[in-house]
């Protein structure tokens, strides 16, 4: 019996759509996928995977969906864990367009998570969360839904 082949572009598009829909639901903004998934030149101010058209976006939103869970002991033992590679990409793209980095990610059959350098309400600390600090990287990880339900951060200015 032959197993179905997973198209990584389709899987990425599905994860981006899932994140987009959750952002729309919780923010009331008309989030869209970036044409070409962030491949545009920085002069277009469209890096990352999701944005709000016609608005000044405050975040560069990168979305990743993979089969395996990347919040594991590898964060402390691997030279460059996958999550850190994603964060490096998110941070690099955010810097190119002068925005705050925001990484949304999930693994197969999981909820969506968010990695961010900002949160605005100490009530978030009553939820489950992680802080990652290694080398030059420090960021927080929350369930995306918790972060969106509690945060009052503005996504556009």
Language model features with spans:
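Catalytic phosphate/metal-binding cores of nucleic-acid and nucleotide-processing enzymes, i.e., regions
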Residues: 1-157
């Amino acid at each position: 019996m032959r197993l179905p082949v997973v198209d990584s572009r389709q899987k990425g598009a599905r994860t981006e759509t899932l994140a987009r829909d959750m952002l729309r639901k919780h923010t009331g903004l008309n989030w869209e996928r970036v044409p070409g998934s962030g491949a545009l030149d920085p002069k277009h101010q469209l890096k990352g995977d999701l944005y709000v058209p016609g608005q000044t976006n405050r975040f560069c939103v990168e979305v990743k969906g993979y089969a395996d869970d990347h919040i594991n002991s590898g964060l402390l033992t691997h030279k460059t864990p996958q999550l850190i590679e994603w964060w490096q990409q998110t941070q690099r793209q955010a810097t190119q367009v002068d925005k705050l980095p925001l990484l949304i990610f999930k693994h197969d059959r999981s909820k969506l998570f968010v990695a961010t350098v900002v949160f605005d309400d100490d009530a978030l600390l009553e939820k489950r969360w992680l802080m990652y600090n290694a080398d030059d990287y420090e960021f927080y990880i929350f369930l995306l839904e918790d972060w969106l339900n509690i945060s009052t951060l503005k996504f556009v200015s």
